[in-house]
Amino acid sequence: MKLQRQPFEAIRLEQKTIEMRLYDEKRRQIAVGDTITFRCEEEKLSVRVIALHRFPDFAALYAALPHSKLGSTDPKDMVQYYSQEEQRKYGVLGIEIERMTL
């Protein structure tokens, strides 16, 4: 999965442990125990999925999950990536992760 620099670094530093995505067809394939490789430019970072949190929209996700794990405190931040219409159509997913040790 591609990430912008700020969330990539927050995950690398273990300051962000829940990645938020639209619950589209691609994300429906994710299961607890899966490995996800995040990419930012040429860098890669592998994590393990430890929990999945489904919600109807990002407002509900932000209301239920600790902001300290999300890397952001405002659900409106996600509108730049996913419209309200997309959120209503698919729902959203909080992918709880842990860094993998080599």
Model-predicted segments: where are they?
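Glycine- and charge-enriched low-complexity intrinsically disordered segments
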Residues: 65-102
